Amino acid sequence: MTVHFPFQNSYAALPDNFFARVAPTPVAAPRLIKLNRPLAAELGLNPAELETAEGAEILAGKTVPEGAEPIAMAYAGHQFGHFVPQLGDGRAVLLGEVVDKNGVRRDIQLKGSGPTPFSRRGDGRAALGPVLREYIVSEAMAALGIPTTRSLAAVVTGEQVYRGIALPGAVLTRVATSHIRVGTFQYFAARQDVEAVRRLADHVISRHYPDLAGTERPYHALLDAVIARQAKLIADWLLVGFIHGVMNTDNTSVSGETIDYGPCAFMDGYDPKQVFSSIDEFGRYAFANQPRIALWNLTRLAECLLPLFGDDKDQAIKEAEAALDGFAAQFTDAHQAGLRRKLGLFTQVEGDQPLAQALFDAMAAVKADFTLTFRRLSDAAGSGDDAPVRALFEDPTGLDEWLPRWRQRLADEPQTAAERAAAMRQVNPAFIPRNHRIEAVITAAVENDDYAPFEELHAVLARPYDDQPAFSAYAEPPQPDERVLQTFCGT
């Protein structure tokens, strides 16, 4: 059975300075451990073909499928605020692009596929643990309804990688609407290659924002569009307690998808200053700082686009600043609208923002569990029973002051209690990929070659808004000895 990929590649048709042509490095004994069958079908691929030995070889990079044009993409980036003029795909290869069943062009990329010209002394490989983490979290984000790259497959390579100790090697097949980043623009801007910036901008407009192609000022409109998508994306993150952990400009997608899950984590107890990433020692990418960092990253994109705005540099700067000034309102509108939905408020009145903030203050005072607080408020909205949500607060004084204000506000809404509770359950998940659960899954796979815990967690997270009583343990926060205090970059 020949594995068929209906490749229609566009990025590989750009000039050679946009990438390096490099094939994945073959591995010893690839074995498929997970295939995302629904995603495969959505991409126009045959899952049965991918589950063959030949399919595993392709997904591990041992065999290059017909029609692929493997490349490592060039990009630069600000890493923790420090500019690095050349980064690029150091352990990933873009096999090519397919047009999915909805007419959307999607990249198919192998992560952990071996060294490239951008590897910078690295081995280009990935360990099994980070591959499983990205698979779990990216698919959980998709199930939550948050724009994200996707995971098509995970394959073990039959080889070991060395990260202080020997670990099983693995390859993740990542799917994205594109892998073009703010750092991709920075790569060419740093080289003062205005024509390449223009070519890249035209490609992004054609691929992601085709409605802008015929507008009078397409590059201004492109900046506006990327700002709008990032504002909505960061609001989505905050509404589920997600901390990206490494919001460098090379990890900021111009398509508005969450990309690069390295040290990401979901909060358990609410703390706006929460940091998990082991390398974020000063809290640059802390939970509540993410909107500010997104704007900082977008400002770097605007700097790259300035030469396309016109010959009058001062005027171009004013126009870029005006666009960037719109980010705060767009983020706030999206975030506040999301918070109203989470609180069961379907109309907007003055005082809603202070009401939400008062709840966060009460949660922060005792580090109440972020996810369960909102889920149990959903139940309380229907039943009138506040005891389950109060049980999450070691000292419920702040919550007890807040609950009457909330109920008084709910009385102004037209919905019945049952309607309100049902709507709240659709935006307040019961299940998130909690750090201690991910670590348990990784331990079972790495130490015992046991993927049953991975399969079970993945299945539960595919239905985050359903109660799933048989799996209620997955909704619980960690015990003190289960808490994960730090996460690490991996893939």
From Swiss-Prot:
<dbReference type="GO" id="GO:0005524">
    <property type="term" value="F:ATP binding"/>
</dbReference>
<keyword id="KW-0548">Nucleotidyltransferase</keyword>
<feature type="binding site">
    <location>
        <position position="124"/>
    </location>
    <ligand>
        <name>ATP</name>
    </ligand>
</feature>
<dbReference type="Pfam" id="PF02696">
    <property type="entry name" value="SelO"/>
</dbReference>
<dbReference type="GO" id="GO:0070733">
    <property type="term" value="F:AMPylase activity"/>
</dbReference>
<keyword id="KW-0808">Transferase</keyword>
<feature type="binding site">
    <location>
        <position position="174"/>
    </location>
    <ligand>
        <name>ATP</name>
    </ligand>
</feature>
<comment type="function">
    <text>Nucleotidyltransferase involved in the post-translational modification of proteins. It can catalyze the addition of adenosine monophosphate (AMP) or uridine monophosphate (UMP) to a protein, resulting in modifications known as AMPylation and UMPylation.</text>
</comment>
<feature type="binding site">
    <location>
        <position position="251"/>
    </location>
    <ligand>
        <name>Mg(2+)</name>
    </ligand>
</feature>
<feature type="binding site">
    <location>
        <position position="123"/>
    </location>
    <ligand>
        <name>ATP</name>
    </ligand>
</feature>
<protein>
    <recommendedName>
        <fullName>Protein nucleotidyltransferase YdiU</fullName>
        <ecNumber>2.7.7.-</ecNumber>
        <ecNumber>2.7.7.108</ecNumber>
    </recommendedName>
</protein>
<keyword id="KW-0479">Metal-binding</keyword>
<feature type="binding site">
    <location>
        <position position="91"/>
    </location>
    <ligand>
        <name>ATP</name>
    </ligand>
</feature>
<dbReference type="GO" id="GO:0000287">
    <property type="term" value="F:magnesium ion binding"/>
</dbReference>
<dbReference type="InterPro" id="IPR003846">
    <property type="entry name" value="SelO"/>
</dbReference>
<feature type="binding site">
    <location>
        <position position="181"/>
    </location>
    <ligand>
        <name>ATP</name>
    </ligand>
</feature>
<keyword id="KW-0464">Manganese</keyword>
<keyword id="KW-0067">ATP-binding</keyword>
<keyword id="KW-0460">Magnesium</keyword>
<comment type="similarity">
    <text>Belongs to the SELO family.</text>
</comment>
<feature type="binding site">
    <location>
        <position position="88"/>
    </location>
    <ligand>
        <name>ATP</name>
    </ligand>
</feature>
<feature type="binding site">
    <location>
        <position position="260"/>
    </location>
    <ligand>
        <name>ATP</name>
    </ligand>
</feature>
<feature type="binding site">
    <location>
        <position position="260"/>
    </location>
    <ligand>
        <name>Mg(2+)</name>
    </ligand>
</feature>
<feature type="active site" description="Proton acceptor">
    <location>
        <position position="250"/>
    </location>
</feature>
<feature type="binding site">
    <location>
        <position position="111"/>
    </location>
    <ligand>
        <name>ATP</name>
    </ligand>
</feature>
<feature type="binding site">
    <location>
        <position position="90"/>
    </location>
    <ligand>
        <name>ATP</name>
    </ligand>
</feature>
<keyword id="KW-0547">Nucleotide-binding</keyword>
